[in-house]
Amino acid sequence: RYNPERFLIHDFTTGPVSLDRTFDVCWCVEFVEHVYAEYILNFAVAWQQCKNLAMTHATPGQGGYHHVNEQPKEYWIDVLDQYGFDYSESMTEELKLRTTMNTHKKPKKAFVRNNGLYFKNRNL
């Protein structure tokens, strides 16, 4: 059940969300490929409140319902660098190695193992 003290619902096409605290980690799976590039600022500002960021992304040609922003990992590394995030190759590999998310499903559905990325916020 929805508890407003634990969850925040926000439409990032309307602008950034205001957060009044920091977080240890942001876990973002199956999101960025569904958001037009013009709205990246709106969610990146929220992510700046997180010390660590683990995310997935869809690659060009991967396909999927409402995939409007399929990009290679280098794109996300460059974009997130502009918002203060340093890509960690070692933590990305650790994330992919240890994930159990969807590993029992078809290989294409193993989102973290296939296209997981890990970043550290250099400003927190």
Language-model segments: what does each one mean?
Residues 99-124:
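Core SAM-dependent methyltransferase catalytic element
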Residues 70, 93, 102-104:
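General N-terminal targeting signals
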Residues 64-65, 97-99:
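Short secondary-structure boundary/hinge segments and terminal tails
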Residues 80-81:
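Amphipathic alpha-helical segments
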Residues 84-97:
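Conserved S-adenosyl-L-methionine
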Residues 1-66, 70-77, 120-121:
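Conserved SAM-binding loop
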